């Protein structure tokens, strides 16, 4: 989903960068030394310089991934006043409200503007780990358009 979103942005001349947390070894947030870890410092800089951030996350146990929550804890104030959207992937349709806890936290803790067009996908939207749903592609396109419009206002 993140790669398709980046394609949507690039097709409109909007720069896009994907950061895959699987490729960024992060320490667990310990409230102390973890904040000075080189990867944390690098990601904090990237986040603080971004205007719009779209978070792509799997949903586990009715919540965003622990890796994503750890990133937010480690990079804290870099999130101040960001425009944030969500791409969520879950096994089934019943957790569609699950991202609200994280969205509320970003909104209240860091005054992020949350794009009210979440993309929520289920296993039915994929075939062989590839997007197969026209409806999902359309929802991602609408998220790209909404985030670009909000960014430019």
Question: Which residue ranges define each predicted feature?
Answer:
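N-terminal beta1-alpha1 ligand-phosphate binding loop
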Residues: 1-13
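Short beta-strand elements in bilobed, periplasmic/extracellular small-molecule ligand-binding domains
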Residues: 13-25, 112-121
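Alpha-helical scaffold elements within enzyme catalytic domains, especially in hydrolases
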Residues: 7-8, 45-46, 146
